[in-house]
Curated annotation (Swiss-Prot):
The chain crosses the membrane at residues 15-35, 51-71, 167-187, 205-228. Autopalmitoylated (in vitro). Residues 36-50, 188-204 are lumenal. InterPro entries: Palmitoyltrfase_DHHC, PFA4/ZDH16/20/ERF2-like. One of its GO terms (biological process) is peptidyl-L-cysteine S-palmitoylation. Its main location: Golgi. Substrate binds at K132. The DHHC domain is required for palmitoyltransferase activity. The gene is zdhhc15b. Residues 123-173 form the DHHC domain. The lineage of its organism: Eukaryota, Metazoa, Chordata, Craniata, Vertebrata. This is Palmitoyltransferase ZDHHC15B.
Length: 332
């Protein structure tokens, strides 16, 4: 027991190494750009002030989104998806697997659940003792079930899911903008140092490496950001792209794809003026999502999006009522 605790403690400590590396590179880039480029290399005051203003806007947005991606805790299923004491006792004492499955089916009929395991059974997490909502998965690193889990990202040392997916996307976008701005403004001075128009000194080293590091990070981020833009457009998570969710008629990668406009609003919210600001605006509460396979008139979550507001009582009641009838439809 003591050994396992020590190993988990070491794992938690080492898991911060990628974040420390990124933070160190960013802090160095701040010093190199502000002091070595703007204050040491640049001679034009107007150019210096302009570069500093734009740079600090990019730097603040990068830090803000990175902070939110790291420290926003992953959302977990609410109590209504956990087994009650009576159901848990009945489930654990039952030795017949087919009866255990039926117990979970009976409980799930009261919940807005449409997806199943590959075998067709109710998706149940033995570790968390919870019936998994649609798009929810257990993270072995965080040791909990995460709503609309996309992946566990070592570079933010956090699970990317429903609660912080918008922040993660903004982090990628502002990281690219940060790199592009640095590379585009440093390039002319890189050439001047390279051909010898500017004298050698500490600034030369920083300016040369600023360009290389900015370009290297931009290229890697460009592919990752492009991939996640495609996922958002299709309303898929990374896990769903590799293993499509299973519905009544089998696996369907486009099961949650309700159109580009609605897909974007699910992640970024209704108000476009808040799309590029790292504040939580995603629709719903992460437990249930509109389905493409149901007509809009039959899908209460798609036809009545105003019910997605975080109103615990009314939201749960409508979900219970609609979830039960719709679940029977998918199992028929």
């Amino acid at each position: 027991m003591a050994l396992s605790r020590a190993l988990r403690c070491c794992q938690r400590i080492f898991s911060w190494i990628p974040v420390i590396i990124i933070s160190s590179v960013v802090l160095w880039s701040y010093y190199a750009y502000v002091f070595e480029l703007c204050f040491v290399t640049l001679s034009n005051n107007l150019e210096r002030v302009t570069y500093l203003l734009i740079f600090h806007v990019c730097f603040i947005m990068f830090c803000w989104t990175y902070w939110k991606a790291i420290f926003t805790p992953p959302s977990t299923p609410t109590k209504k998806f956990h087994l009650s004491y009576t159901d848990k006792e009945r489930y654990e004492m039952e030795e017949r697997p087919e009866v255990q499955k039926q117990i979970l089916v009976d409980i799930a009929k009261k919940l807005p659940i449409f997806t199943r395991a590959q075998s067709g059974a109710i998706r149940f997490c033995d570790r968390c003792q919870v019936i998994k909502p649609d798009r929810c998965h257990h993270c072995s690193v965080c040791e909990t079930c995460v709503l609309k889990m996309d992946h566990h990202c070592p570079w933010v040392n956090n699970c990317v899911g429903f609660s912080n997916y918008k922040f993660f996307l903004l982090f990628l976008s502002y990281s690219m903008i940060y790199c592009v701005f640095i590379a585009s403004t440093v390039f002319q001075y890189f050439l001047k140092f390279w051909v010898g128009d500017l004298p050698n000194g500490p600034a030369k080293f920083h300016v040369l490496f600023l360009l290389f590091v900015a370009l290297m990070f931009f290229v890697s981020l460009m592919f990752l950001f492009g991939y996640h833009c495609w996922l958002v457009a299709k309303n898929r998570s990374t896990l769903e792209a590799f293993s499509p969710p299973v519905f009544q008629n089998g696996p369907d990668r486009n099961g949650f794809n309700v159109g580009l406009s609605k897909n974007l609003r699910q992640v970024f919210g209704e108000h476009k003026k808040l799309w590029f600001i790292p504040v939580f605006t995603s629709q719903g509460d992460g437990h249930y999502f509109p389905l493409r396979t149901l007509r809009e008139s039959e899908n209460p979550l798609l036809a009545n999006e105003e019910k997605w507001v975080e109103d615990g009582g009314s939201d749960e009641e409508s979900a219970d009522e609609n979830g039960s009838s719709l679940l029977i439809r998918t199992e028929s």
